[in-house]
Design a protein with these regions (language model features):
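A non-catalytic, helix-rich entry segment at domain boundaries
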Residues: 110-195
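Extended, charge-rich, solvent-exposed interface segments
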Residues: 52-103, 109
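Short, amphipathic alpha-helical segments that act as regulatory/interfacial helices
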Residues: 104, 108-115, 254, 258
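Flexible glycine-rich surface loops and low-complexity tracts that mediate binding to linear polymers
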Residues: 33-57
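Accessory interdomain/linker segments of ATP-dependent helicases and helicase-like nucleic-acid enzymes
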Residues: 1-9, 151-154, 158
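Conserved structural-core and active-site-/substrate-pathway-adjacent residues in large, well-folded domains
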Residues: 81, 107-108, 214, 253
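Mg2+/Mn2+-dependent nuclease catalytic core
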Residues: 6-41, 189-273
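Hydrophobic (often cysteine-bearing) scaffold residues that line and stabilize catalytic clefts
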Residues: 99, 103, 107, 153, ...
Length: 273
């Protein structure tokens, strides 16, 4: 049951296990949460001894229908346009292939194969490209290209891929393995173990699901010392490394993995075309 008040909306809820009634006050951005008498909600936060909980822009969270898992990608896409995110999820339309899309997909798959094998030498990478190309033959024809042209383009990307791996795929952080967080803090980082590839993660706590490119173990060194963390690793290709949807998606994946593994951090590899 909901009851509007001057500075928010009050939900009278029944806790599933204890059958006790409690009150949740929704304020600010949470005020318009479309709760109905039959809604299931999950509260991430604390209740007072009298059974009161205030949810606003700074305190606590409410997940509406957490049993209906929504793709983290769909949620992230909604930051740009709510309608677009819904339409993309419901209408599985396909657009014409283009060269950046093809090269981005190939780079994504090549990176994953190299990460799985922990092998970054030129011979292995070229052999992997040769194995990937037959599966992209129709797309190559659609963009009026040839396998030879596509392979040459991918060969031009190998030096920077190998340079990145030399710096970051190591047992211990190197002096040049510097990463900068969004708050400006700097750390040294190394990827020292691959835990999973294309990991499917479901989180009824947050009502989210996701398919994470790779889950890796990293070592971080900063002013607080050395830490070993389990992190989601997302391979992003495109023109805009500050894309709001990319940032939102990686933040949501961080939530998903924190639910499974505990405290984690986040990193992403970006390639521009």
């Amino acid at each position: 049951m909901t009851q509007p008040i001057d500075d928010g909306q009050v939900l009278l809820v029944e806790e599933e296990k204890t059958k006790l009634f409690k009150a949740i006050t929704l304020r600010q951005a949470w005020y318009d949460t479309p709760c109905t008498p039959e809604s299931f909600v999950h509260v991430i936060g604390e209740f007072s001894q009298t059974g009161q909980c205030v949810i606003d822009d700074h305190h606590n969270m409410l997940i509406l229908h957490p049993d209906h898992l929504i793709s983290a990608t769909v949620v992230a896409d909604s930051f740009g346009c709510l309608r677009r995110a819904v339409l993309q999820d419901r209408v599985k339309a396909t657009s014409r292939a283009n060269a950046p899309m093809l090269y981005g997909t190939l780079l994504h798959e090549l990176f994953q194969e190299a990460l799985k094998a922990n092998t970054w030498d030129t011979e292995f990478l070229l052999d992997t490209i040769d194995r990937l190309l037959p599966g992209k033959f129709e797309t190559i024809l659609e963009i009026n290209s040839t396998c030879e042209e596509v392979k040459e383009h991918m060969k031009s990307k190998l030096p920077e891929l190998q340079s990145w791996a030399k710096i970051f795929v190591t047992a211990k952080p190197r002096a040049d393995g510097l990463v900068r967080e969004r708050n400006g803090q700097q750390s040294l980082m190394s990827i020292n173990k691959l835990l999973d590839v294309e990991e499917h993660v479901w989180s009824p706590m947050y009502g989210l699901k996701g398919n994470i490119d790779a889950t890796v173990q990293v070592t971080m060194q900063d002013d607080q010392g050395e830490r070993t963390l389990t992190v989601p690793f997302e391979v992003k290709t495109g023109k805009n490394s500050s894309n709001a949807a990319h940032v939102a998606q990686t933040a949501l994946y961080n939530l998903l993995l924190s639910n499974r593994y505990g405290k984690v951090t986040l990193l992403a590899f970006l390639e521009r075309y």
